[in-house]
Amino acid sequence: MAQVQGKIVQCIGAVVDVEFPRDRMPKVYDALKLEGSPLTLEVQQQLGDGVVRTIALGSSDGLKRGLMVTNTGNPITVPVGKATLGRIMDVLGNPIDERGPVDQSLTASIHRKAPAYDELSPSQELLETGIKVIDLVCPFAKGGKVGLFGGAGVGKTVNMMELINNIAKAHSGLSVFAGVGERTREGNDFYHEMADSGVVNLENLGESKVAMVYGQMNEPPGNRLRVALTGLTIAESFRDEGRDVLFFVDNIYRYTLAGTEVSALLGRMPSAVGYQPTLAEEMGRLQERITSTKVGSITSIQAVYVPADDLTDPSPATTFAHLDSTVVLSRDIAALGIYPAVDPLDSTSRQLDPQVVGEEHYQVARQVQGTLQRYKELRDIIAILGMDELAPEDKLVVARARKIQRFLSQPFHVAEVFTGSPGKYVPLSETIRGFKMIVAGECDHLPEQAFYMVGTIDEAFEKAKKVA
């Protein structure tokens, strides 16, 4: 069948209206190619009278009325499979790493249905991260979905990098990293970090363990809206080959924001706080595809920017519903100099259940949270009356809570260059043993500074000797 041609009748920024013969209009989500240009347009609406409204996936500079456009008859397709490993691609699957073309022999559409209900396979297996606070109070599930929530500058990307460092390097499977509307510098840093650690094999790209898809801050909204789907399509193809895949998204909020921009450009009526009326549906369509089947698993770790530190904002609130574990980063904890700045009282996990993690882990985690909660309640009294007015048992709770708070900090491998402290990976068994000793009162004689920025409890005892 011959490809149908149309012509541009209107350009408003990233929105381009194209007129086709009335009986051969493109379908919604069809990809249109501009003649004599690499620009791709994606159909978003059919306006009637043969006119379709499209979003430009690239710069619309130089477009004018009357230019000819060809309908490809298919949605956007991107390369998938082994050819993507070790490569950096844009939203359309074009290489942006100056290492030659990507093999297009295996491609897939970025728009596809989520797996059927009977194909799904929930997992109870824990994924150890080596980060104490996460392993203790909000453990991750293999094949689960994790969100890192935080405002500006509290450490989402650093935490994401450490998780990649601890999990992706030890993980024998493959990883896919989707950079959605974040800083180009961070994407560049990530690539070099992966190359230095051997996850990207520069000598033989096919031996690499990670595929990267970037649609950064400076890209048009159409690119930022679709780049998460491009990354997900690559991850799905690896999963359908029977592999266990790690899928990192930094930042899922920018996906929502790009949707808001596109929605406004298309002339839709905004809903709460100016977001698109289709926010829940767009988020659901993406998140329902990030799932594990009986063939293979996708474990997804997503950074979620929280506008103005407001967790009730519609964008983070919509994301919450889809996650198995939520890691909430707090500005108050970061202000105390405790990194990672994870709030152990706000962070939750579906896995923190005695039938999944075991009775000992569950009890220790709940005792730690109980001690910290009691300290939080006592802080107002301490601020007004001072420590001396507290009952002896409350003084003990405060002392233990401050030790727990400091013991929840940990030096990161990816931050070694800034802190000068070597990074620490703490096994889950050591994490449980350490916190169990603190809540049982076995460390009451140690000064609280001995617990700051150490790995295991044994290191805290060593540090206490030096402090003394």
From Swiss-Prot:
PROSITE patterns: ATPASE_ALPHA_BETA (PS00152). Keywords: ATP synthesis, ATP-binding, Cell inner membrane, Cell membrane, CF(1), Hydrogen ion transport, Ion transport, Membrane, Nucleotide-binding, Translocase, Transport. It is an enzyme of class 7 (translocase). It catalyses: ATP + H2O + 4 H(+)(in) = ADP + phosphate + 5 H(+)(out). Produces ATP from ADP in the presence of a proton gradient across the membrane. The catalytic sites are hosted primarily by the beta subunits. Belongs to the ATPase alpha/beta chains family. This is ATP synthase subunit beta. The gene is atpD.
